[in-house]
Amino acid sequence: MAIGGEMRLDDCQPAGREEKPMIESSSHGTANMSKDANPSVIAQHEAMLNALPFSDMRDFEDAARGFLGTIENGKIDHPQGRVVWSLEPYGFLGSEQAPPTVNPSLWRQSRLNMHHGLFEVVPGVYQVRGLDIANMTLIEGDSGVIVVDTLTSIEGARAALELYFRHCGTRPVVAVIFTHTHTDHWGGARGVLDGHALASGQVPIIAPNLFMEHAVSENIIAGPAMLRRAQYQFGPFLAKGPRGQVDCGLGKSMAAGSVALLRPTDLIMATGDKRMIDGVEFEFQMAPNSEAPAEMHFFIPRYKLLNLAENCTHNFHNLLPFRGADVRDALAWSKYLNEALQLWGGKAEAMCGQHHWPVWGSERIDTMIRQQRDLYKFAHDQTIRLMNHGLTAAEIAETIRLPKSLEGAWHGRGYYGHIRHNVKAIYQKYLGWYDANPVNLDPLPPVASGRKYVEYMGGAEAILARARKDLDNGEFRFVAQALSHLVFADPDNQTARALLADTFEQLGYAAESATWRNAYLFGAQELRQGMPKTLPRPPMSRETLAALRTSQLWDVLGIRLNGPRAEGKHIVLNWNFSDTGETFVLNLENSALTYSESVQAEGADASFTLARATLDEVIAKQTSFPEAVAGGKIKLSGNAMRLAELMGLMDEFPRMFEIVEPKRAAVT
């Protein structure tokens, strides 16, 4: 009985891949040759060099401050031999001058994100940075160390903790804090907590309220689609180099490695909550529905240290990531930052976040928080203002400009989020996908509309002739739109694929946003080479399964049901879990799988009694359902083949599906 695989955004990451000359022929027969930067792209870069304060080196000083030591080349290996993380392929970033194929502002951010190792923030507070996309913060108490966020992978977290021990001495981990629900902040928890600590329950795991609900909802329900879309956001399959992946804004990239979700033992419920942890007092502020649906900030009076999690970073953050998520609330985000100023303004002497580098000095800290507050408030209010003048999302994105006071702040640049796509997210939050123009109410899908566009525009050769001319003239955005219609109409047109790839490439070279660059360059690569091949998705880990409620497992089963194949079927199954005391009825009817809790159905097709732990073993493929029945772990009555019939109606989600070209296989 398979529910679904581990829904991580990093499990296809070929870490440590270096750039190679891209000249091989792809499976589509298109020469995989990257092009030089167009003169118009170079002109854009020169204009940016003149517009932004590149002589300001304060960020570089802050990023290097307090350095104690690192791991050579930032390289972390998995016990099975594969590379979990390595900065060695990014050696090309040693040059201060950006090449023509990388936006100079993004080049600057990419170089800042190369600082890696253990850093002292203030005596008693340390950070491991640059060994994952996220940071691990280590806070010394009276007898041990408190770990804030455990990076993406178990291997990375273990290496980070060992690095701290090597330079600061071995101390027991006395508590773990998860600032929010994204995988790069909790995935490595088993790397800092040994089996005894977990079994004894003596080490508290502290997290914001509703942590578990939100930690699993993104990764489990929409995981397959998110995983594929994340490849465009982070660029894991791009070669690393001046013509490939250079950064992702928040850090270098997602880490590979083993991930496990541990359930918190202590939830922070409200702003003003305090905890005394190993003699150190923490003051908490709740920040739900900001960068994550469950997130929190904290201040430590002993160290005069402020940590705003991921809500005050050295870039304009995402309000809607390319991988997909619920739209984040820019208005609430700005209010939380304003509240942080009211709570702790003038009190903090150091501020560190869970990405990027710290800031020191109360005046600089308060200035940065105010500017970040106003960045999200400006984006929110001006989007709504223009929306209420009747502008659509696309029109607002084309119109809005940050005020000069924010535009010139390095930490307000759009390396991860970007003003142009963040305003579209704000529009979506309030008005949804529809712009009220009836032409967009029920348009043709891409293949059908592509064929009609090609017909209306005079055929493929006419489009290609005009596209070549406009590409040379730097009209990349419309050339991409026109050629995309042609590729969807005729995906085997090698000339169209190659020209669209060249166009995406120029858009990537021009992009200041790392995520935009990754998306454009990966789109170009897939047009030239086709989709990369990946390994089968692994089953969910026992730790992740144990962290899920049984009702969440049924939700996952429901989204896998193939409705058309289930039409006309009615299956009712009773479940009784002996270890948790839970009972459920699963009901397939009207091509929908529903469940009721704390009841059993009379006349059910079959009934199963088992431990929830046994179900976890089956899903994790540590045993099979028939083996568990034969071994006495599952007791059944009725027609067990009805369960097999139900499972036969489940889809297996592919790891890969086409994005920049039509789906090759029909989906029903």
Residues of each region from the PLM?
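Divalent-metal (often Zn2+) His-rich catalytic cores of metallo-beta-lactamase-fold enzymes
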Residues: 28-45, 49, 305, 315, ...
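Conserved beta-strand hairpin/beta-sheet module of binuclear metal-dependent hydrolase folds
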Residues: 110-171, 296-300, 304-310
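Active-site metal-binding motif and surrounding structural segment of the metallo-beta-lactamase
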Residues: 143-144, 154-206
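TPR-adjacent "capping" and linker segments in tetratricopeptide-repeat scaffold/adaptor proteins
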Residues: 371, 439-462
